């Protein structure tokens, strides 16, 4: 299963960090203990709201209580936990306040992510609304040092354990720092979330030398930047693998 896969990844020479992005539903205490034993470097929980009805509408099932229980157990055993919240059209101030209340006294990162114009998503930067809320309601401090390997920029709030991060792929490009590629659920290597071009890797499974060669060549073709601002992709994130 995936736990065995993660353990093997951690043991590979040259692999410096392995993190997991998940909805958290199946990460019960036993699984969290095994992830701790594997040495997982971080777990990102995708949680867009703490309203159980809204959560069920987004995810298709009412599992929020289980997800939060799993998250809190992960925190209790010392795992590096981040919460990723996409600021979509249904995101409200009530959602924001609930997330702050939940995370405030936890040693976690709460990151607000700009909705990318994929599928039917519209171009609107609601991250600015979130940033304005923090600026007007809290005593905040910009964190100048880099936290982790990702593109988020962070702030601290006085008297809170959590740190707050913002990721704005469209309105504050970070393409010049991006060193990521994505393997889709269909076995294709995407060099950029937006670009339509991808490289099929399935034909090379079983030939490790050729597979490595194709992947190395592909990485050198990574686009210099995305063009979300010019046109909209019809692809949705769950088709890509995120």
Protein language model annotation of sequence segments:
Residues 101, 105, 115-242:
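Auxiliary Fe-S-binding modules of radical SAM enzymes
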Residues 1-113:
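Radical SAM/AdoMet-radical enzyme domain recognition
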């Amino acid at each position: 299963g995936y736990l065995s896969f993660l353990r093997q990844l951690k043991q590979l020479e040259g692999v410096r960090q392995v993190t997991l992005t998940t909805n958290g539903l199946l990460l019960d205490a036993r699984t969290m203990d095994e992830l701790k034993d594997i040495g997982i470097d971080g777990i990102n929980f995708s949680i867009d709201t703490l309203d159980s009805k809204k959560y069920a509408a987004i995810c298709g099932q009412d599992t929020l209580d289980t997800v939060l229980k799993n998250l809190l157990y992960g925190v209790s055993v010392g795992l590096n936990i981040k919460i990723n919240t996409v600021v979509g059209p249904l995101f409200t101030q009530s959602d924001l306040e609930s997330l702050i209340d939940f995370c405030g006294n936890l040693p976690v990162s709460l990151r607000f992510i700009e909705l990318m114009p994929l599928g039917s998503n519209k171009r609107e930067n609601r991250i600015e609304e979130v940033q304005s809320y923090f600026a007007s309601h809290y005593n905040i401090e910009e964190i100048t040092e880099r936290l982790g390997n990702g593109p988020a920029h962070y702030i601290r709030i006085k008297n809170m354990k959590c740190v707050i991060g913002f990721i704005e792929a469209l309105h504050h490009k970070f393409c010049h720092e991006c060193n990521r590629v994505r393997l889709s659920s269909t076995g294709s290597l995407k060099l950029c979330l937006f670009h339509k071009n991808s490289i099929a890797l399935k034909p090379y499974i079983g030939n490790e030398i050729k597979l490595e060669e194709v992947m190395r060549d592909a990485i050198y073709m990574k686009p210099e930047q995305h063009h979300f601002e010019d046109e909209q992709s019809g692809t949705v994130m769950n088709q890509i693998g995120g």
